[in-house]
Each structure stands twice: as structure tokens, then as C-alpha cells.
Regions:
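Acidic, surface-exposed loops and disordered segments
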Residues: 1-271
Length: 271
């Protein structure tokens, strides 16, 4: 629904490939990739390992990296850290554009949550409470203790989460809005084109950015809703591209970035 052309899927695959390349340096291996050797419908990549790689210092942050989806401190990011992150992405920290992006990212998130078919896509991927999160540590986790208790008592159901008039739904929306606006800066990644190779390379660059964020003691949270290509968010898609992309460029990633108030690790499957 929200990723009709599978653009985000190919970015995800690029993230995996870069994680593989970085982690291989732990054993002194370098990895060269043949990307999409049989075209879009074949393998994503063929990886060739060889000895002799230098240790990548970002490898130590792979297991602690996570998407920090909570509110950020209003503490501004120091210029030296912005400069470090600018090796990977563009950091938007000026107040005028930050304010505009806060509003756009909230507007488009609200649209996604109030559009029945895209809301259902999200609800289907939700993991409600500790039990569901532990059984399937992927998707969209709802970890708040109160939600966990209500769900276990049968006082919260997926049907309720699809009811936009329900008080619980409105409370969740209000919490999401507060989080969206508690953002001191944004990270932006663009590509000159929008081919599958561009998307995979965007994912590879994004992984290095994400690990660099962790190394600097910051948090980041992708806000991809405004970059999605379904009709209901076309206005926000155009707004973001007019603001952040040069002629012919595609904004592949947009994320909140800042200091975490209460860092909570994202659930993951065991290795």
C-alpha cells in the first residue's frame, strides 16, 4: 500500500549489504558486490569475500544501533557532530526548515493513520505488548505497559486500533504528534536518479549514517511517510522534494535526529 514500487524494500536490502560489508571486517575480510547480476527480478547481489580488509570502526555499533522512535531532547546537535554526519547525509538544523519538516512529517503521518487501507497495513504489522514482541520481534512494536495490560485483558483489540473515532486511537495519535514535533534536526539522503541501483546504494549509505549516529550518542528515526508514492500523500511528497531535492534528484530517506531522552532498543530476531 505505502510502498507501491518497492523502493523502500530495495533500500532495506542496501542496508543489509552494507551491514554485511562492515561486519566482515571484524574477521579481516573485504566484500565486493555484484549488484542485481540478473536484473531486478533475480538475486539482489552476489557477494565475493577476500582477505586483507582493514577493521571498520563502525562495526562495534552494529548490535547497539536502533531506530529511536521516542521524543528527542531540545538540545541542539553540536556542529562537530553535524559535520561528522554530513559525510553521509545532509543535516537540516536551521529552525525555519526544521519547523516546516516537523509539520510536513506530522501531516503525512496523520494522513497515513486516517486512510483506512494504509492504517490497516500498519495495524496488521503491529506487535502489541511483550508477548507479541517477543514472539515476532519485527514490525511496529507497541510496548507501553498500559497498552500491554489492556490488550491482555481484551480491552484493546486490533479492531479498536482501526476505529479512528475510538478514544484510544486519538490518544495514540496525540502521543505520535508530540513525538514528531520533539525533533531538533532532520537527516536527508538524496540520489541523482531513482533506479534500483540508486535505491540499494542509498540503503548502503544510510546504514553508515545510522551507525555513525550511534557512535556519536545520538538517535535517529526514519520518517519515510512523506517519501512514499501513493496518491493520498502526493502533496507532501512534492513539498519535501521542492524543499530538499535538486532537479532530477529523489529524496530516498528522511529522518528525525537528536539526543535521546529514554533510549529503548528496537526488538530484533536473534542471530
Amino acid at each position: 500500500m505505502t510502498d507501491p514500487f518497492n523502493r523502500q524494500i530495495f533500500i532495506d536490502m542496501g542496508c543489509f549489504l552494507q551491514t554485511l560489508k562492515i561486519s566482515a571486517t571484524e574477521t579481516g575480510h573485504s566484500v565486493n558486490f555484484d549488484i542485481l547480476p540478473q536484473g531486478e527480478n533475480g538475486p539482489t547481489a552476489v557477494a565475493k569475500f577476500s582477505k586483507g580488509a582493514m577493521h571498520d570502526p563502525l562495526v562495534q555499533f552494529i548490535t547497539s544501533r536502533h531506530s529511536e522512535k521516542e521524543a528527542y531532547s531540545n538540545h541542539n546537535i553540536e556542529q562537530d557532530k553535524i559535520s561528522e554526519l554530513s559525510n553521509h547525509v545532509t543535516i537540516i538544523a536551521d529552525q525555519q526548515r526544521v519547523d516546516a519538516l516537523r509539520q510536513i512529517t506530522w501531516d503525512v503521518l496523520e494522513i497515513e493513520m486516517l486512510t483506512p487501507r494504509t492504517l490497516k497495513e500498519s495495524v496488521d504489522l503491529m506487535r502489541i505488548g511483550k508477548r507479541e514482541i517477543n514472539e515476532n520481534p519485527d514490525g511496529i512494536e507497541l510496548r507501553e505497559p498500559m497498552l500491554d495490560a489492556l490488550y491482555n485483558l481484551g480491552l484493546l483489540t486490533r479492531e479498536m486500533l482501526l476505529d479512528t473515532d475510538h478514544s484510544g486511537f486519538r490518544d495514540k495519535m496525540n502521543a505520535m504528534q508530540r513525538t514528531s514535533f520533539a525533533t531538533p534536526a532532520f537527516a536527508v539522503l538524496t540520489t541523482h536518479g531513482n533506479t534500483r541501483h540508486d535505491q540499494i546504494n542509498a540503503g548502503r549509505n544510510w546504514m553508515r549514517y545510522s551507525l555513525a549516529v550511534t557512535s556519536l550518542g545520538l538517535g535517529t528515526h526514519p520518517m519515510s511517510q512523506a517519501l512514499q508514492e501513493y496518491p493520498e500523500v502526493s502533496t507532501q511528497y512534492d513539498q519535501v522534494h521542492q524543499m530538499l531535492a535538486k532537479d532530477g534528484e529523489t529524496v530516498q530517506m528522511l529522518a528525525r535526529v537528536g539526543y535521546e531522552l529514554n533510549a529503548i532498543a528496537t526488538p530484533r530476531w536473534a542471530l
